[in-house]
Regions:
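Glycine/proline-rich active-site loop of Rossmann-fold NAD(P)-dependent oxidoreductases
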Residues: 9-14
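Acceptor-substrate binding/catalytic loop of class I
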Residues: 16-19
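Accessory helical-bundle/CTD segments and flexible terminal tails appended to RecA-like ATPase motors
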Residues: 28-31, 40-43, 47-124
Length: 124
């Protein structure tokens, strides 16, 4: 499904959906708990954590139920009450990343999600 807030989109805004984080090992175990796993270390270019909103964007970021909205810094749009609506300003040092996320998806929850979404992700 398309992000359900598309009717809210206005020029220059960035929407970031709140989603649970998960560990690569948990993803592997969700797909096949019997698959052989080998720890090889971090490879060139590989990241340990994914950052969706950095602290440099916190000045223009507001929190809503289910998502964050980053407002454009130009033309004072980030202080426009009609763009902010019912949003709550995030703290100055805020970042939304997999290592700071408080919501984590368990192996069983991921297995259920995979089962429920087979038609969207395929059978391989």
């Amino acid at each position: 499904t398309l992000f359900p807030y598309t009717t809210l989109f206005r020029s220059g805004e960035i929407y970031v959906k709140k989603i649970p984080s998960m560990k690569v090992v948990d993803i592997a175990n969700s797909v096949s708990k019997d698959a052989k796993q080998e720890i090889v270390g971090i490879r060139p270019g590989e990241k340990l954590h994914e950052q969706m909103i950095g602290d440099e964007d916190a000045l223009h970021t507001y929190e809503y139920d289910g998502y964050f909205k980053i407002l454009p810094a130009i033309n004072n749009w980030s202080s426009d009450a009609s763009r902010i609506g019912k949003g709550k300003k995030v703290p100055v040092n805020f970042r939304y990343a997999s290592d700071t996320n408080t919501e984590w998806m368990s192996v069983s929850a991921l297995q259920k999600w995979i089962k429920d979404n087979k038609n969207k992700i395929g059978n391989n």
